[in-house]
């Protein structure tokens, strides 16, 4: 009996020692695991995420580089990148240039009346389902308060329509949410635009190119522009159309591996539908 007790005590002592060693090893592994996870989160949190960089090549003028700010206007940035990646801007013009104010481009019609289609975003749609689209205006007057960018020299912002000037004061929301593909680059500060248009980036190289474009010879416009960077200047006879075309030969975007996706699209406002809904007049029947 004494021999058994002695053996049992020794066995228990060895087992306890082994258990302590296992516990220590387990604790070391847990600490290492927690440390690794914590470092991973720290690295992710502190890792510099580069903003997308736009390279805009303008024929006979040079290259403009812009940094986009997705944290300020995510839908606007997503929209611009998707259009650029699908070659939408290649070959379009700066169709509206106002010295001391801005240069405007990105219209498929080349006169301010065009709109992008869903297919221009790289969305796979059937021909009979492809349609013009617009995006929500990411600025204060439209209920969006995360965009704190100001319309300073070098800022790129979205042009939009102002139906309140042309048709009815009731069309404020439709006006605010009418931007599609047209953009403008500020050549001077203009605080009157703050809170009413969606700035989403800034020129970081080639501001001299922007100013050279700003100084080209211009003539009176031949048509009213549906999308503008200044509603008070959207009527015809504004002297802002370049005598010689200023062509955007190519636009590329370096996203540094980040996928900015596609923007949430809205249906464009339709004048004929609005007239019918408001006044009960079907103008479509008079179209040829």
Place the predicted regions along the sequence by residue.
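Cross-family detector of peptidyl-prolyl cis-trans isomerase
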Residues: 2-288
């Amino acid at each position: 009996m004494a021999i058994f007790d002695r053996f049992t005590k020794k066995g228990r002592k060895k087992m306890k020692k082994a258990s302590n060693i296992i516990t220590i090893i387990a604790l070391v592994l847990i600490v290492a695991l927690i440390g690794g996870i914590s470092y991973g989160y720290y690295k992710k949190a502190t890792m510099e995420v580069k903003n997308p960089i736009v390279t805009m090549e303008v024929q006979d003028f040079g290259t403009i580089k812009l940094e986009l700010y997705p944290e300020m206007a995510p839908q606007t940035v997503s929209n611009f990148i998707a259009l650029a990646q699908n070659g939408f801007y290649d070959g379009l013009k700066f169709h509206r240039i106002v010295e001391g104010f801005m240069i405007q481009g990105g219209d498929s019609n080349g006169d301010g009346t065009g709109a992008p289609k869903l297919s221009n975003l790289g969305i796979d749609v059937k021909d009979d389902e492809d349609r013009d689209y617009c995006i929500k205006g990411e600025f204060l007057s439209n209920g969006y308060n995360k965009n704190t960018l100001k319309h300073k020299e070098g800022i790129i912002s979205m042009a939009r329509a102002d139906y309140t000037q042309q048709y009815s004061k009731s069309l404020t929301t439709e006006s605010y949410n009418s931007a599609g593909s047209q953009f403008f680059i500020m050549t001077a500060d203009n605080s009157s635009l703050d809170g009413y248009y969606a700035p989403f980036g800034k020129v970081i190289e080639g501001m001299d190119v922007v100013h050279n474009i700003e100084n080209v010879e211009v003539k009176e416009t031949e048509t009213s522009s549906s999308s503008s960077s200044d509603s008070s200047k959207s009527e015809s006879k504004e002297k802002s159309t370049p005598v010689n075309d200023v062509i955007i030969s190519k636009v590329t975007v370096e996203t540094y591996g980040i996928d900015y996706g596609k923007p949430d699209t809205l249906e464009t406002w339709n004048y004929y539908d609005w007239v019918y809904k408001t006044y009960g007049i079907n103008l479509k029947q008079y179209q040829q």
